[in-house]
């Protein structure tokens, strides 16, 4: 394999959904894992030299430090089962490469790239490097392909070469999108959203909960100060409520809460993107062709 598999005018497109999948995989990675590694799925169009990355899934891996060498072992059975499961719903998607959330290439990248070279059969695998540390306030993405180097009969190696990456997988002409934006700008009427009523409901529930907690604290203080006779039914209900809550320290609760909040925000963002894409596609389908 060589870089000739990818011509200079080859277009590699990355769907935004894949980035959200990689972010989610990084957030839900095993506790001892520093990075997330996974498989990239997509479509190859050899007629116009286009590769579109449309899907991905995380692959479980283990990292071992052997001297100065870092060895990464993938769960190949898990990767195979995930690919077969994806083929049931999306048989047109094939393995086009792999991703890693490390900040830079490592010595183990060559071994992982060799594995995906076998999975991609007659095509060169892509390697997407996504740095999620947000250095400079940006989500840095880099796309590589592997180029074998060395002399015949001697030591051989692999050199990673950067490829251009287009982060929008659309074939719609820019002028069409601009016309849609212009129409919305000239007609700024918007329907009231549902976010504010939902926030008001959350606020009302929170205030009601605070009132009940204040009432409960006053009752406990009055009983301890012998200003009120204790009620066995109330005490039994309090005991059952307290014992039903798992005991955990403040740091564990904070991590669990933040993880759940991230999941909710990712779900909301993804659903909003899908809704916007559907609305935009519907608008574009009704535009006249010029």
Swiss-Prot record:
Q: Does the keyword Protein biosynthesis apply?
A: yes
* UniProt GO MF annotations: metallopeptidase activity; translation initiation factor activity; translation initiation factor binding
- Which CDD domains does the UniProt entry name for this protein? MPN_eIF3f
Q: Which Gene Ontology CC terms are recorded? A: eukaryotic 43S preinitiation complex; eukaryotic 48S preinitiation complex; eukaryotic translation initiation factor 3 complex, eIF3m
Q: Does the keyword Cytoplasm apply?
A: yes
InterPro entries, per database record: eIF3f (IPR027531), EIF3F/CSN6-like_C (IPR024969), JAMM/MPN+_dom (IPR000555), MPN (IPR037518)
- Report the domain of life of the source organism: Eukaryota
Q: Name one GO biological process term.
A: formation of cytoplasmic translation initiation complex
Check the record and name the Pfam families matching this protein. JAB, MitMem_reg
Residue ranges annotated for the MPN domain, each copy included: 12-150
Q: Per UniProt, which keywords does this protein have?
A: Cytoplasm, Initiation factor, Protein biosynthesis
Q: Where are the transmembrane segments?
A: none
Locations listed in the record: Cytoplasm
The primary site where this protein sits is: cytoplasm
Function, as annotated, reads: Component of the eukaryotic translation initiation factor 3 (eIF-3) complex, which is involved in protein synthesis of a specialized repertoire of mRNAs and, together with other initiation factors, stimulates binding of mRNA and methionyl-tRNAi to the 40S ribosome. The eIF-3 complex specifically targets and initiates translation of a subset of mRNAs involved in cell proliferation.
Family from the record:
Belongs to the eIF-3 subunit F family.
Tell me what this protein is called.
Eukaryotic translation initiation factor 3 subunit F-2
Q: Which gene encodes it?
A: eIF3f2
